[in-house]
């Protein structure tokens, strides 16, 4: 059986890989949306902060022998602290003036961060060991899905639903929405 001239197995496999990639994009865009919604800043440094988080996790794993799950918790905490420091020291002064200044500042910060990381780590990516729990794969009949890819979808669902719950169903969320 074919869908659009593509064998069903290949179509479902590509659909599932699209879901995995879309899960990464969902988490990235969620951060952008929350920052813009709360601060009114278009954060061009968001991708650079994502990169910094990836390198924090990699450095923890590779250089300090940190457990994968500990690095997974440590990376967003470090990036969150960096984001708070940027907001308190730089962005806070720009709220009452033209939004273009916040955009230019975050764009400049992104260029600086990317330049620093390119200088110290180069332009190729770094590999890291996949934890034993995620090294296996699941046979779905139409494809074999590595567990680490299923983990991405699961983690994205937890993060997105957790953020929705926090913003829509808690007092903190009501406070944040009231702005």
Which residues does each PLM region occupy?
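Small-residue-rich transmembrane alpha-helical segments that form helix-helix packing/gating elements
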Residues: 1-39, 45-179
């Amino acid at each position: 059986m074919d869908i659009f001239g593509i064998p069903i197995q290949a179509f479902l496999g590509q659909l599932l890989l699209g879901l995995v990639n879309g899960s990464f994009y969902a988490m990235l865009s969620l951060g952008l949306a929350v920052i813009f919604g709360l601060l009114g800043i278009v954060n061009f440094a968001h991708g650079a902060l994502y990169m910094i988080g990836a390198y924090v996790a990699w450095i923890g794993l590779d250089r300090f022998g940190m457990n994968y799950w500990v690095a997974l918790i440590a990376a967003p905490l470090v990036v969150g602290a960096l984001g708070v420091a940027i907001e308190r020291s730089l962005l806070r002064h720009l709220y009452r003036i033209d939004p273009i200044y916040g955009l230019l500042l975050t764009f400049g910060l992104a260029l600086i961060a990317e330049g620093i990381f390119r200088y110290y780590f180069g332009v190729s990516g770094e590999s890291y060991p996949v934890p034993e729990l995620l090294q296996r794969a699941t046979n779905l009949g139409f494809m074999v899905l590595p567990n680490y890819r299923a983990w991405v979808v699961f983690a994205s669902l937890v993060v997105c639903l957790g953020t929705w719950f926090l913003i829509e169903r808690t007092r903190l969320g009501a406070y944040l929405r009231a702005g």
